């Protein structure tokens, strides 16, 4: 399905729950797609990584401030409202959604992605691939590659890198947030958000 990139917003849900597996991205994707089947075919949709606190063994803990944020078409609001009170089963852990509110994308000069999917572990090859995508999107600004991480997908480890761009003009900032970089938006990859400091990529 072709995405209406101009209509993309952030849909923010409060959460009730205790813990999730540290590597929960694919399980969360599946749980949400059961409630919103169109997520699987909507090219513009994305699920932001959850901000969790390290817990015992292989668990990560939710805090009172943890939010589920989806990047979706604003025209889906009625379907998103229907999720209020729904309990997701994420690898055997319960996650209850609160009432959604929408937040517009902000055209800030500095954008950060917690993870962008890479074909391999080589940073220079990753940056070359990103440069090609950014050129196609006509996006300038300074690029900074950050931390290499791994993400479980279909039982295998996938390499990702964090990434920051700064010095963007408003039109470029919105375009990058609307289109993203690389694949796997529903695993939280390639989704850029406004950020205040370039120091974050090294964290």
Q: What role is predicted for each listed range?
A:
Residues 1-203:
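RNA-interacting cores
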